[in-house]
């Protein structure tokens, strides 16, 4: 948590970029949430009356289809601009962090490098900062913002359409928060080992290239290759375990909850239909299913990048 707060503090240097990115994100989210409402209107107020009257209203249909396409284009444009601004400011922040690390290395005593390979130092300055840029600022922060904004917007819309369904769907939030914390705890171990082994690989590779003449002079080629293979094998094994854990905990649970929610919504409205109290149209049912999917999409994306926050 302390590391995350420190990384978040660098956003103060890019206030303008963050503000513009948030505005673009709000624009994109607003357009995305408006799309299902427009589709609902098309189904209930354009297509259904045409079917009942057996009259094809081409003008009205084209008008609302055009509105639907425009809304989606606005959402795409907002998402694109948000991605551009977030990636741009993440590059500038990564440069600042890399410069600070490099300046800090210059002040370290010589004894610090006695037992630390030069390749590992280089790895910390280059690859580790690149990992922070890609996993935290590009994927993590952007995903976190979009997830929060999208979830708040979806729940507000669902509550406006049907307060009962909105209250029922609220149980998903604590379930996903608890699950995310469980996944983060388990992934932290593998992620730390992954970064440590990657640094060792970089250090061994750097040393073997710089000291190639000495290695050959003392005929240590087989030993160097064996050490590198052992480290590489450990790195691959840790990566495999991390991938299995991430795939199982993120995709499996989210997919299962989505299917259960779909079943629950369909069952709820089916019982109303059988009891003769169904007060929902085809368009409204479509909107509910669409918004339920939009609840899980940001959560699923966030679960896939949660390892980058470790």
Where are these regions (language model features)?
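Transmembrane helix-loop-helix hairpins at lipid-water interfaces of multipass membrane proteins
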Residues: 18-78, 159-164, 263, 267, ...
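Helix-loop-helix
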Residues: 50, 157-171, 245-310
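Residue-level hotspots within the lipid-embedded alpha helices of multi-pass solute transporters
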Residues: 28-33, 72-76, 88, 92, ...
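Membrane-integrated ABC transporters
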Residues: 1-35, 47-65, 81-86, 90, ...
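An intracellular "coupling" helix at the cytosolic face of ABC transporter transmembrane type-1 domains
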Residues: 110-111, 129-141, 186-203, 207, ...
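Juxtamembrane helix-loop junctions of ABC transporter transmembrane domains
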Residues: 24, 31-47, 71-118, 122-126, ...
């Amino acid at each position: 948590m302390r590391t995350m707060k420190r990384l978040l503090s660098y956003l103060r240097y890019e206030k303008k970029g963050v503000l513009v990115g948030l505005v673009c994100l709000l624009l994109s989210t607003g357009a995305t949430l408006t799309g299902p409402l427009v589709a609902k209107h098309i189904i209930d107020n354009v297509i259904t009356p045409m079917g009942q009257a057996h009259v094809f209203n081409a003008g009205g249909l084209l008008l609302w289809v055009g509105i639907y396409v425009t809304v989606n284009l606005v959402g795409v444009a907002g998402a694109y601009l948000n991605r551009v601004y977030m990636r741009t400011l993440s590059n500038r922040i990564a440069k600042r962090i890399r410069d600070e690390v490099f300046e800090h290395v210059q002040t370290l005593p010589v004894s610090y490098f006695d037992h630390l390979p030069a390749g590992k130092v280089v790895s910390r300055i280059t690859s580790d900062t690149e990992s922070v840029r890609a996993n935290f600022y590009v994927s993590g922060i952007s995903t976190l913002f979009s997830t929060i904004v999208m979830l708040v917007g979806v729940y507000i819309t669902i509550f406006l359409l049907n307060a009962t369904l909105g209250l029922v769907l609220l149980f998903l939030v604590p379930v996903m928060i608890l699950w995310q914390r469980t996944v983060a705890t388990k992934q932290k171990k593998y992620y730390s080992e992954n970064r440590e082994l990657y640094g060792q690989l970089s250090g061994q590779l750097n040393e073997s290239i710089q000291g190639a003449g000495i290695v050959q002079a003392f005929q240590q080629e087989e030993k160097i290759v064996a050490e590198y293979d052992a480290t590489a094998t450990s790195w691959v094994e840790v990566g495999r375990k991390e991938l299995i854990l991430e795939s199982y905990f993120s995709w499996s649970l989210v997919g299962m909850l989505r299917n259960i929610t779909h079943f629950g919504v369909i069952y709820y409205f089916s019982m109303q239909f059988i009891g003769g109290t169904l007060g929902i149209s085809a368009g409204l049912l479509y909107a509910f299913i669409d918004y339920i999917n939009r609840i899980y999409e940001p959560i699923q994306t966030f679960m896939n990048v949660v390892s980058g926050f470790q």
